[in-house]
């Protein structure tokens, strides 16, 4: 039995055709509409010469058309490839070439960038433009308009039989280097990231029809909202998971905190997905400000908050629980290269350590391996790397060297994905995440993981956001430098921040430099821009105005 992305969606569309699948602004689709439109679009792609195995990119802001494009690509067994809409021309040229794109869906506003690089990409033949009224004349590109592509395609689902081996490629920038394409088999990504395994019970789905049959048997639908960019893994996989399960998925084009709360009220959203503090802090502070002004929003439908892919500080979790005492908060760890690695349900009594990453129950097939690729003993205090076996990616596209570094064969003979996240195994078997090794600071032989220092700093009432990096030091090799964004009207000295943090982390981990900025640079997914912070810290500037 094959678990294929397109098949799983079609099963749900057949089971609950009239139910709402997607909402974005005033645009919405039922499952039947979404299926027919993506089927038509798939036929148009095939008519343009896209064949099974061809790579087709999606370069656009969040929209229903983004999801329709993914479904269309997978329906004809081609390979969807995400494109970061923040990339400049040089980065786009690299990604389009590295990914061997044969086709591209792009938002109208990004047309000029596509035009600037297309002539150097002989493989890229098929262009489909998602119209949004934000672009310039596209005559030099001669794209097919998205709605024309839908209109001209056949609505008949007469596609060749699909396979669990059909691929999805997710490009990830990580914390360093050029973007790398992670190759997932359809079946593997379903079980690792798209709901194929229950994160609480660890029980896998046994039939490709199991989720669609449950959706048909249910009396109603859950309403999920996924504000992060679809171009990143978290929102992309969550959106498809919701479709497989027959839920309503609410998308937003851009992250605007006040609009998020108003949409939660309007659509009676039950569950919200965020990416750590970069989204959580603005959300809770905006809500607090709205309510302080006397605004009364009906948020009674809001039942759960899920965070992944970035640090979600205990202090911020506590503010959500102060406002929503019965809110179920889950904090999970994982990576594009490995899939879901673990989860913790947060409560007032279990907010997490103010220094260090989340402490989670490991997911199915997740272990921590030591330097000899053997499992770390619980409670030993040994720092190892998080690794995941089972349903994991094939590797990086066209990069065998980095593939060999990230996917390893351990002492037990099993193949594991090991992206580089350091962790310890506690006595009870839970995992405490310490941070990514590529940004680890070595000061006098002691290892300092930026995330634990960042969490300690962000627990200070004056600090809105912080990124920590290592800078050269004649005596210690490296010293800890903090780049900090204060709350409006607030300030603190380096000594005040050190004194506050001393209660949470060891003395050698305390920052020895403070660089104050008016805005911390982060990716749209909420991840810290460590190269930016390191360049800033090494510049010697201690008060820096960051342009919007």
Residue spans for each PLM region:
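Conserved AMP-binding A3 loop
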Residues: 30-32, 167-195, 199-203
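Conserved AMP-binding/adenylate-forming
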Residues: 34, 247, 265, 303-332, ...
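AMP-binding/adenylate-forming catalytic core of the ANL superfamily
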Residues: 87, 93-96, 104-106, 389, ...
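Conserved AMP-binding/adenylate-forming core of the ANL superfamily
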Residues: 18-63, 67, 71, 88-93, ...
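Conserved AMP-binding/adenylation subdomain of ANL enzymes
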Residues: 192-227, 231-273, 286, 290-293
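Flexible, low-complexity linker/hinge segments
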Residues: 1-3, 135-166
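Structural core segment of the AMP-binding/adenylate-forming
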Residues: 47-48, 75-150, 515
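Conserved pre-ATP/AMP-binding loop-to-beta segment of ANL
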Residues: 17, 153-171, 178, 213-223
């Amino acid at each position: 039995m094959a678990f294929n992305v397109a098949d799983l969606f079609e099963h749900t569309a057949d089971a609950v055709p009239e139910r709402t699948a997607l909402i974005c602004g005033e645009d919405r689709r039922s499952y039947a509409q979404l299926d027919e439109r993506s089927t038509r679009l798939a036929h148009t792609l095939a008519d343009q010469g896209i064949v099974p195995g061809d790579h087709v990119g999606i370069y656009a802001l969040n929209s229903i058309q983004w999801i329709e494009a993914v479904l269309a690509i997978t329906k004809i067994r081609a390979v969807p490839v995400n494109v970061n809409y923040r990339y400049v021309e040089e980065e786009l040229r690299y990604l389009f070439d590295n990914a061997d794109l044969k086709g591209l869906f792009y938002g109208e506003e990004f047309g000029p960038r596509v035009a600037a690089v297309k002539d150097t990409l002989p493989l890229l033949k098929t262009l489909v433009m998602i119209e949004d009224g934000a672009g310039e004349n596209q005559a030099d590109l001669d794209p097919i308009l998205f709605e024309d592509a839908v209109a001209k395609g056949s609505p008949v689902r007469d596609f060749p039989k699909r396979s669990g081996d059909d691929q999805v490629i997710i490009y990830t920038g990580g914390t360093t280097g050029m973007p790398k394409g992670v190759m997932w088999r359809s079946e593997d990504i379903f079980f690792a990231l798209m709901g194929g395994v229950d994160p609480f019970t660890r029980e896998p789905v046994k039939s490709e029809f199991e989720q669609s049959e449950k959706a048909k048997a249910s009396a109603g639908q859950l309403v999920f909202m996924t504000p992060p960019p679809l171009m990143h893994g978290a929102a992309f996989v969550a959106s498809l998971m919701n479709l497989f399960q027959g839920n309503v998925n609410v998308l937003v084009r851009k992250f605007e905190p006040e609009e998020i709360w108003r949409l939660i009220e309007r659509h009676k959203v039950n569950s919200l997905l965020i990416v750590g503090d970069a989204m959580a802090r603005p959300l809770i502070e905006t809500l607090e400000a709205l309510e302080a002004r006397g605004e009364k929003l009906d948020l009674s439908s809001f039942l759960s908050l899920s965070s992944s892919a970035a640090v979600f500080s205990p202090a911020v979790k506590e503010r959500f629980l102060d406002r929503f005492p019965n809110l179920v908060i889950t904090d999970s760890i994982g990576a594009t290269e490995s899939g879901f690695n673990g989860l913790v349900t947060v409560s007032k009594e279990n907010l997490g350590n103010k220094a260090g990453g989340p402490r989670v129950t490991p997911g199915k097939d997740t272990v921590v391996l030591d330097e000899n690729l053997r499992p770390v003993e619980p409670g030993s205090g040994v720092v190892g790397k998080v690794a995941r076996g089972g349903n994991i990616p094939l590797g990086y596209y066209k990069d065998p060297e980095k593939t060999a570094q990230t996917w390893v064969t351990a002492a037990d003979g099993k193949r594991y994905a090991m992206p580089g996240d350091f962790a310890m195994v506690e006595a009870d078997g839970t995992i405490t995440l310490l941070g990514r090794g590529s940004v680890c600071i070595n000061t006098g032989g002691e290892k300092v993981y930026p995330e634990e220092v960042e969490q300690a700093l962000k627990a200070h009432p004056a600090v809105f956001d912080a990124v920590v990096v290592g800078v050269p030091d004649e005596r210690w090799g490296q010293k800890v430098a903090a780049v900090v964004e204060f709350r409006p009207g607030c300030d603190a000295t380096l000594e005040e921040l050190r004194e506050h943090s001393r209660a949470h982390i060891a003395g050698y981990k305390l920052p020895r430099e403070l660089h104050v900025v008016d805005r911390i640079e982060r990716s749209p997914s909420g991840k810290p821009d460590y190269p930016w912070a390191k360049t800033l810290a090494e510049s010697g500037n201690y008060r820096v105005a960051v342009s919007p």
